[in-house]
Amino acid sequence: MKQYLLSVHMVEGAPARSDEEIQRSYQAVDAFNRELMASGGWVFAGGLLPPDTATVVRAQGGKVVTTDGPFAESKEQIGGFWVIKAADLDAALEIAGRGSAACAGPVEVRPFQDVPEAG
């Protein structure tokens, strides 16, 4: 099984959702997470705080420099993610479609690089 990153994208300036819509989304995501766990596809997941809570860390000239705010100035930021196991890209895309429906937002799918096992 290969691992994939499913990134949930939040669009800056999108219409605010009602408390009821947010609760429905939380419930749908919780059900989706339970499905992933039951199927053996779950590796890890998390929701992120807004981009204004980010700190960028850079090593420059032998020093570590930190900057408040997101790395990229963009209308879209990652709001959360899943790391999943799937048989292939088609299976990962199918899972991402269910995740997108659950969180009511776009989900980007990216495979992890294959890393040789240590030994």
Name the predicted role of every residue range.
Residues 1-119:
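Conserved, structured core segments of small domains
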